[in-house]
Amino acid sequence: TAQYKAGGTEMPAEMGINMNYAEIKYCDIANGPGVRTSLFVSGCTHHCPGCFNEIAWDFEYGKPFTQETIDAILASLEPGYIAGLTLLGGEPFEYANQQGLLPLLQQTKSRFPQKNIWCFTGYLFDKDICGQMCEKWDVTREMLSYIDVLVDGKFMQELKSLNLKFKGSSNQRTILVQESLAKGSPVLLF
């Protein structure tokens, strides 16, 4: 099997080599509080009508996600004015993307524990992620351990509102992940 070097540790290829990303936005102010680096992963099976990033549904779209990509993202997080990292897509919680994102999350929290990590997902935190994925895949539990805020729920065009803070439709929730895991139910940021 091909090897993938992350943070000086050899890891199997399935831990990250097989993920693509659509775009990286540096100095982004639209996808979480403050100035951030936002990574748009490729691959999504939700196919929400009215999706703002339909091109990223295809898992093969974009560029390969590599340790060099991780290094560029980490370098972008160094300035003090950068508040954190945002993951969106595509769908970060697709299984293949979870495996690809885990080394980035590990290295981000290790180097920048003061920076917050936001993630946008079409899956529901309690029903899909904690209720099913965590039971099937250890990578999901570990991924959640690094995420501070999760915006969950599919985009629903009929519930779209431009007045919502960091979400596209009113069914979506902004969840404090660590507090929710400790409590055993979703704790909303707003």
Describe each PLM feature range.
Residues 1-16:
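N-terminal amphipathic/basic-hydrophobic helices that include classical n-h-c signal peptides
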Residues 12-40, 53-59, 186-190:
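N-terminal [4Fe-4S]-dependent radical SAM core
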Residues 17-22, 35, 53-133, 138, ...:
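Conserved Radical SAM active-site core
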Residues 30, 126, 183:
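Flexible, glycine-rich phosphate/dinucleotide-binding loops
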Residues 36-51, 91:
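Cysteine-centered iron-sulfur cluster-binding motifs in ferredoxin-type domains/subunits
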Residues 45, 91-92, 124, 155, ...:
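Gly/Ser/Thr-rich beta-alpha loop segments that engage phosphate groups in nucleotides
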Residues 136, 141-190:
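Classical nucleotidyltransferase
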